[in-house]
Amino acid sequence: MRLDWFLPALRSNRPGNRRRYPGRIRALGIRMLPRFLFSDHDRMRRGWARRMLVWLGPVWAAAPVRRVIQSCCLITFLVLFFWVCWPYSAQPAAPSSGWIPAEFDYDRATVRLLAESADGAAVAEIGKTSTVFVTDVSSQRTYGERSGNVAGADASDGESAIRVAAAGEGTLSLDLSALSTDQIDELSVSAGPWDLSSTGPGSWPRHYATNLEQREQMEAEFFLIIDPLVSLSTAVASRDLVWSLTAAAGILAVCLLIPRGFCGYLCPLGTTIDLFDWAVGRRLQRFRVAADGWWVHIRFYLLLGVMIAACCGVLLSGYVSAIPVITRGLLFTVAPVQNGVANGWHQVPEWNSGHVVSVLLFMGVLGLGLLRPRFWCKYVCPSGAVFSVANLFRLSERKVDSSCIHCNKCVEICPFDAIKPDFTTRTADCTLCQSCGGVCPTHSIHFTGRLDFVELKTPNDPPTHETALGRRGFFSAAVGTGSALAGGVLSALAINGGTSQAAQNLPVRPPGSVPESSFLQMCIRCGECFKACPSDVLQPMGFEQGLNALWTPQVVADWAGCASSCNGCGQVCPTGAIRALPLEEKRYARMGLAVLNLDTCLPLAGREACQLCVDECTAAGYNALEFVQTGTEIDALGNPVPGSGFLSPFLLPELCVGCGLCQTRCYGINVAERKVLDRSAIVIEAGEGREDRMFNGSYRELAGHRMDR
C-alpha cells in the first residue's frame, strides 16, 4: 500500500537514480496539459508548475496536495462561519402583486398568469417557491389553505395546496387541482389582479429558519463535530451518547489510515497558525526555544486533565479544544467587525470580561508560534493528543530506506518535529503531511502500510541520544501525570462549587436548552449559537455565574428579543446542549417568564399610559399580554369617573414563552430613549416553573397541557 501524494524532488534520469513519479498519471497529464508545465528531467529544468509552487514556498513545492486541502478546509470553515451563520440577509417573504390570469384550463385545473404590473424582484422570488397562496384582490379571498386549515392556526404554517407547475420570465403556471370544485369555479371567473405569496394569511413567520436551512448545504457545525475531544469529553461529562460521537468515530477511523491527518490537513486552527507563523513568527525569532524541553508532552497531560474533569461532570474541553478555540476567537475578534460594517456599529453588543479572556486566549495560541512554529499544535493541543494516542493503532506510517544520505532537509521542513536526529519517525507526532518526502533528494522516504516491507536505514545513525525511559524521565512523567490528575479534580471541585453558589440567580438560556446542570456539561462554549442569532439576543456570559458558566449563552433581553421566525441556535449546536427544534416546536419552547414590576410600570404605577409591551407581544403572535383597566377613580355615588385610570398590561403566563421582545421594547423606549425608567418595567426571569427544560418530548404538547389547566 502506497500513500505517496507529495511532489518528489527534481532528479535527473541518470542510471541508478530512482524516480518516484507515478508514470501513468504523469503520462496522462503530459498528454492533456501543456508540456511547459512539466519539468525536464534530462536537462534538470523546472516546469512552470513547479516554479509557481517554489515561489509559493518550500512546503507548497514539497506537498502541494496538503496545502490545497488545508486551503480548501480553511475556506470552507470561514464560509460556514461567516456566511452560512449570517442571518441578517433573511427577510420576510414579500407578496407579489399584479398578476393577471391569461389562460385557464378548467379540465386540467391549471392557470397561466402574466406579471403585468408585478415587481421584477418579487416575480423572480415567487418563481423559486414550490407552492403559493392566491389572493383575489377584487373579492379579498385567499385560496390555497389545505382542508381543515384556519388562518392563524398552526396548520397554516404548512405549504399551500396550489403548486407552481412552471415558471418563466414574467409568467407562472399554477396547478389548482388540489382545490375544491367551488374554489376552482370562483378563480376561473376572476379577471384579477391576483396577489401571490409563499405564506398564507396569519401563518407563523419563518424567514430566518428558512434562510439558514437554504444555506446549510453542509452542517454549519461540521468542524466542531469532527473534533473528537469535543464529542468524547461531552459524552463523558453528560453521561450521555451525544450524536456527534458518530462523526468523531468517523474522523478517528480515517486517521488510522492517515495518522493525525486532522491536524495536518483539516484543522482550520492549524492552518491559521501556519499563516500567523508565516506572516509574523518568521520575522521575530528572538523568543525561540529548543525543540526538547518539559513542554513537549503538555498536550497529553492536558488531555488527561480534561478527561478527568469530564469524569467528575465538568466540561473543560470547550476552553482548550482546537475548533472551539478558533470559532470563539473569530466570534469575538472578526465577527464584530463583520456585523459593524454590514449593519452599523451600534448593532455590536458591548464586551464583558468573557470577551476579553477569550481574545487573550486566542492571541496566546497564535503567539506561541513565536517560541517555535506551530508550538500549539506540536506541544499543547489536547485535540491533537487524541490523534497521537490513536496513532498507536495506525495502519500506515512514514519509513526511510537505506539510500538516505543524512542531508537533514526532512528535519528542517517537518512542521511537527516528528523526525528524529537519525531521520526515523516519532510516530506519535507524524501527521503524514509528506513535506519531508518532497524535499528528499534521494527519494528515500516512503509512506506505506505499517506492515509493508521497506529496506529500512540503520536506526540510531547518526546517534539520536534518545534512550529508554530512565529515572529522570520516569520522574517527569510521574509529576506530569500527577499534576494532570490533580488539576482535573481540583478544577472540577472549584467549578462545581462556584456553580452551586450561583444557582440562585439562573440566567435565561436559549429556547430548547436542556436542564441547567446538563446544559453546563454539554455546552462547549464554541459560540456558534451567538453567530447564528439574528438579533444578538444570545450573548456570552462572563464570570458572574462562575467559571463553569463562562462563555455559555444567555438571553440579554435588554439588547434584543428572540425572533419568532428563528430556530438557528439549536440547528448549529454541535452537542445537543440546545435541542434542534423545528419552528413549529420552538415557538412553544418556554425559556423564561415575563414579570411585571408593579411599582415602575408606567400605567400600573399610575404615571402615564403605555402599551409598548402589549403591542410588541401581539405583533410577535404570542398574545401573552392583554389590557386591564387600573387606577379608575370613583365618584361620590360609586360610579367610575370617565377618563380616569389607565389600560395596563396583564400577563397570561400560560401563553408567555419568555422571548424578551416586551422587555426589549420597554428598555429601548422608556429607559434608553425617554429615560423615564432606570430599568425595564417588564423583565424575563428563569427558574423553577418559569421555563421548560427537557431532553426530549414536545414543547407543543406541554404548552397545550399548560393552557388546559
Across the structure, where does each feature detected by a protein language model lie?
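Non-ligating segments of multi-cofactor redox enzymes
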Residues: 2-144, 148-152, 157, 163-165, ...
